[in-house]
Amino acid sequence: MRVPIAVQLGLLVLLTALAGLAALAIATWINNYNFVVDVKSQSLQLVASIKSSQITSNLDLLETTSKTIITRILIQSALQRYYAGNTTEENFASSITDVQSALGSRGYLSLYQASIYARNVENGESKARRLLNVTSDEVPEIRLPYDHPNGTAVMLGDEGLGYPPSLYPNLTEDATTNKLYAFDGVPITTNQPLLLGPLATNDSFSLISLSLPIINNTSAADILGYITVVASAANLQDAMSSRQGLGSSGQVLLLAPSRPENRFPTGSRPATATSEPQIAGLDNQEVRYVFRPTPLPGNKRRHSPAVASGASFPLRDYPIALKVLNQPYDSINHSITDLSSKNENGTRVAVGAIQQRSDLVEWVLIIEETHGEAFAPVSRLRKIILACVFGTAGVIALLIPPLAHLSVAPIRRLREATRKSVNPTIGPLSPSLSTMVDPIEISMHNGNEKSEKGGFFNRLKRGRGNLATGHDRDNEPHQFQIPGRVKERKHIITDELTDLTKTFNEMSDELVIQYNRLEERVAERTRELEKAKIAAETANESKTLFIANISHELKTPLNGILGMCAVCMGEDDLPRIKRSLQTVYKSGDLLLHLLNDLLTFSRNQIDQAIRLEEKEFKLSDIRSQLQIIFQNQVQEKQISFSIKFCHPDTPPINDTPEVISRAPGPVYGPPGTAKLKDMVLWGDQHRILQILINLVGNSLKFTPEQGTVAIRIKCVGEEKNPSASPRPESRALSRWRSIGSSHASSRPKTSLDRPRDGGDEETTRPPNLRTLILQFEVEDTGPGIPQHLQNRVFEPFVQGDLRLNRKYGGTGLGLSICSQLARLMRGQIQLNSEQGRGTLFLVRIPLGFVKESPPSTASSMTSLAGSRTSSVFSLDDLASVTKAPSNHSVASQHESTKSNAEIQDSQPRLVGLSQPFFAPPVPQAKDNGLKKIRALVAEDNVVNQEVVLRMLALEDVYDVTVVKDGQEAYDTVKANMEEGKVFDLIFMDIQMPNLDGIESTRLIRQMGCSAPIVALSAFSEDSNIKDCMNSGMDMFISKPIRRPALKQVLRRFTPIPEEAEKPQM
């Protein structure tokens, strides 16, 4: 199908113009439509908000005026005299005058009548007695909408019917609660007065009443009676009948529940600012119009005659009213609009609705307009846009054909000229061929029609040659090449082809630049990869060396265990066997200590964040505990060991040794504090002890015999800004170099590096504490640390000697844990070491100053010995255990040469130490009483079964039943309970086949068994302990099981006699 280019151009222009016109028309329609709708919606919302505010203010005015009446002294005095026994009419004579005076003070609100009721129903009466009926002297003649029985008109203020019954509550007393209710279940309270009405006397006048309790002026809880005030509703009707902002068809409607109290019943409450709506009950509630809707002149009736006469209808018939009641009014303007809604009669209208924000009523105010009036601007806009679109399209359709014909005229001329060049005359070449030249050449030579002979055929041949050459290049394998520049010839006229050539050359130059830049970046990345490769190889070498070292540290105690076990199997002498077993016990405890250090550090590297246990502690306790902990080790190596409170400017040992030897005087803190040794501080005492024990243990390990280890405690200043991390400076520290930041970038981020939340603390820090910077110095005369390792000793698995032939053992985690704990407490750790002269560690920690304690010579070891969890966890300790981090302590202990291993096993030990240290043994109280114990052991491992049986046998427990999983344990307990037998104690492993220990414990507890259940598990994390206790277990023993831990369980649940411990050989 051939379509002329003029037609194509015309259709293209027409379609383009129509598309642009349609886009503009649609955008204009959407924008203006939304604008018109928004303006109309905002207009309805504004009118609804204004009308609602007027009605609310009138109701508030009525409530405020009524409350001023009940506070009058004459009224309250008369009521008090009435309850005192004065029931005469003279008692209320002055009150009647006082009430008439209050009603007659005419202002913006007209008050007509008032009645006062007693506060309770007297004997023999069915409802509360009216004590006072007052009608204002200035009340106009108002005929009520009903007559006397004799047919005469009833006027407001007449005796009897002159007080409209529908405006006065029927106060009856509930026999169960002895409270007065106006209607069935409708109380009258100070926060919820009762509004009745409006009662329409004619088409333009209505009456309303407000009932509220009379509160004694001297006692807010004393109700003297109730009052009902009748007022004019003309202000409400004036606000409803005002035509401002309503247009030609707008109406103001007021919907209310079809109940006399003007509120929805319980179970069908609408939404408020603080409560959700009860949609199910609210949907079927009956509502009515407060004031009858009357059609405007010239408008059709939009409401049925029955509804307009006061009949009720379901709330769901008016969707906008139901929607606004279901919407909480949490903003200032809580009105909603719907320009395409329907009223209860099914008439399509545009409405704006708002819920009255009043404690007196639950009304909905509706601004209603006809749909035609609301969308009249939209209809005009639609007509204008359609007329513009079709009119413009018609004009374009008339103008395009001639314009297209004129526009393609040059193209047609070019086509004719091309036909002359491409279609030569058939026959031999003649000089006339020179007249057939390329039209482009004609234009370039300004009309010159002469060309070189055979120019057309030469160009044709060149074109064929280029095609052939290009075809050959396509067959060649593709290689990336940067295109070369195109030679730019001189030109007079600049056109699109000239711009294209220039842009192509710029692109080629940019490609060359980017290619060279890419080569440079590749070379740079190659160099970085080489550096990374070298670093990886170095790290791999360090890892290999660490594995070799830690393998030696782990295999050394393992070798002692296996070797001495082999000796015991071939030995018959009992004393030698006991000594060999003592060595096995010590080696096993050392192996457990090494594994605990590795596991503790691994937990710190992930998300198990350590939490501080901050509380009050005495600074002197730190010194006392350190002296007792290291007493034996210091005596064995004959090391000069001292712990002193010093002034901030006290020099190190190697500088002036004579200063250390002289007797120091009292050392005080900053002005307003106390002596250092008498200070009571706020912080985590045990984390400070853990750091110091690590540092002192490290110094004692490397210090030779007859050496010196000194601990100095100083207060170097006061922190001015406690919220920031303390970084105090001192002239005495100017020559020391901080290590905390040197390896921060090279180590992985751990949970200790994250800021600590306030919720991690177990106790609340007392307010207004002064923050002091405490400095703990640990100095030794050991070999020192080489200069090249001082930047790395605080990194994990790094030691001063990394060789395989090193003299000292250890995992290399102690100083790393110290650094982590110091950062956790917003402190810092530094070192200064010189090879051959010793090492000085300095720890600065901000602590809160609480008070000064009285001097005491006793050492406090209770906090150290009792604050950390041991191998045994009970239900009473669960609250504190779950709050304390799992790596605060472990239950494994190491045996010393001067105390029994089992007694040491119950003493505390801190993790992350170079060697295990223990507090002195606490004397064990001897148990009295004898009881035969019947025990059940649930354990799937045969070796563990044998260990438990033999350890129970050592405690004279032989009646033991062994099962291999949780299901058998449950079945065994169930069978024994059916036979009337009970177990005195149940040992429950956690990880077992078929049914684990936790689930088995839950089933046993659900069965009603109350026997003590003790968990046995090697997984001693806080989460596991908590799960065990929550399942119903009573205690928790961590594996490996220690005899003191087992004794503690037996002493608690089944007391047995305990023999005195014999010293080991």
Swiss-Prot record:
Residues 739-749 have a biased composition (Polar residues). It catalyses: ATP + protein L-histidine = ADP + protein N-phospho-L-histidine. Residues 549-849 form the Histidine kinase domain. It is found in: Membrane. It is a single-pass type I membrane protein. The chain crosses the membrane at residues 384-404. This is Two-component system protein B.
